[in-house]
Amino acid sequence: MNSAHYDAVVVGSGFGGSLVARALVRAGFKTALLERGQWARRDDVDWDQSEILIKQRYRGTSPLLIKQYGSRDFQRVYANEVVGGNSVFYGGASLRLRPADFARWPFAYGDLAPYYTQAEQLMGVHGEAGADPHEPPGVGAYPHDAIELSAPARRIYETGQALGLQPFKIPLAINFSDATRPLCLRCITCDGFPCKVEA
């Protein structure tokens, strides 16, 4: 039996677990990160909608019981189980919660605002501060400029503007500019799929 000793053990390698483990290691703590999922395969099958969305290739075996506000009943939800947790599947959208979202929480948006900024820097978010008409206060410059819209997205954007709406480019934590890492291919399988190139 392995008798290794650690200063800290973090359970789960999703957003929360990986960031906590990173902070502990950077502070000099010997840290073990436990994950029940396997590595995402990142093969051609990971771009197959049937495999990922219908057959649920990475579906976990332990249900989470979720009760939505105002509902009487709990729902069973099965999270994807892979190294990286749902950070592997979320599509890069990096919006901040709004101050009103914290009304029932034991802390306020302002308490978390500096940590949002740290996370945006760490993840290399592309975005344009001030573009979101409902943006919470204190959003500074993103590490990278917002990405150019694809032709279909540009058409939707311009149509929204013509209708008097205020469309904006969603801040994205996807690599479009750091040539030392794989760059986004601009495929159509971001949200809900593991990125095949890990952009």
Q: Where in the sequence are the language-model features?
A:
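N-terminal glycine-rich phosphate/pyrophosphate-binding loop and immediately adjacent elements
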Residues: 1-110, 114-117
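Conserved redox-cofactor binding core of oxidoreductases
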Residues: 107-199
